[in-house]
């Protein structure tokens, strides 16, 4: 736990979701941030290092303890809150400028979770999430094989799930990541003969960022071009980042993607 390099994990070229989210949020110093489903706390501590006032929420006391230790190792503090995403149990008056949920929604009831989280977003605030999508055949083969490193409650997001955001938020922006860059995972399996049941590839690719950088970076540029020219390819990406906001005047403004 203490060996986690929080900045490296979140700033790696092979962590495009967090790099985009950090740019999207801008200067977060002094902002109130809720990390829902914080896990070991890598994102919570990173946001705290960037100056945010962080509350880390998880249904596991062990995870919250780990997040607290990681914060201490990095010289920052986070407030911990024990609760499930579908039942936040926060004080009704609790408000946050930023609500972050990383790799969470595909484990929970999305509609219920969004309905519980939304009241705690401050006026002018933003909720940002990222999760896997359901449609890429290569990833679906990986999912069928890597049963030992996945959980039974996982349900990668489909089009219907993405539409749920518009039920709860007036403004929705979506960005997509990992298309041709998925070649890295094929190399891991086919050329390097690595076992997806022994290693969590989504963690390995971040940990081995320097090793994959020369391949990843040009493929990422190719992805950007392809996703602009051929928008339907977006649903074949591995992950989607969704940023949502509630207008100061309810029920105004058009949804956009």
Regions inferred by a protein language model and the residue ranges of each:
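A C-terminal cap/extension of S-adenosyl-L-methionine-dependent methyltransferases
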Residues: 181-257
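A short glycine-rich, Lys/Arg-flanked "PGG" loop and its adjoining helix->strand segment in the class I
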Residues: 112-123
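A short acidic, Gly/Pro-enriched loop at the edge of an enzyme's catalytic core
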Residues: 89-98
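Short alpha-helix
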Residues: 154-175
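Class I SAM-dependent methyltransferase SAM/SAH-binding core
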Residues: 34, 40-87
């Amino acid at each position: 736990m203490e060996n986690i390099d929080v900045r490296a994990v979140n700033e790696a070229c092979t962590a495009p979701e967090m790099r985009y989210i950090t740019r999207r949020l801008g200067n977060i110093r002094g902002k109130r941030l809720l990390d829902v489903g914080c896990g070991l706390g890598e994102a919570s501590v990173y946001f705290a290092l960037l100056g945010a006032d962080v509350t880390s929420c998880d249904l596991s006391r062990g995870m919250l303890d780990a997040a607290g230790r990681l914060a201490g190792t990095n010289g920052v503090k986070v407030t911990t809150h024990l609760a499930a995403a579908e039942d936040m149990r926060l004080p009704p008056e609790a408000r946050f400028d930023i609500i972050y949920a990383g790799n969470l929604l595909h484990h929970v009831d999305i509609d219920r979770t969004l309905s519980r989280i939304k009241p705690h977003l401050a006026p002018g605030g933003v909720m940002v999430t990222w999760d896997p999508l359901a449609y890429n055949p290569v990833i679906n083969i990986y999912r069928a094989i890597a049963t030992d490193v996945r959980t039974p409650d996982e349900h990668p997001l489909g089009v219907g799930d993405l539409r749920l955001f518009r039920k709860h938020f007036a403004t929705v922006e979506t960005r997509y990541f990992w298309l041709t860059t998925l070649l890295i995972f094929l190399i891991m399996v086919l050329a390097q003969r690595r076992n997806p049941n022994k290693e969590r590839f989504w963690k390995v690719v971040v940990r081995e960022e320097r090793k994959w950088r020369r391949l990843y970076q040009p493929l990422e540029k190719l992805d950007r071009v392809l996703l602009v020219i051929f928008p339907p390819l977006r649903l074949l990406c591995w992950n989607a980042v969704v940023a949502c906001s509630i207008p100061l005047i309810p029920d105004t403004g058009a949804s956009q993607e």
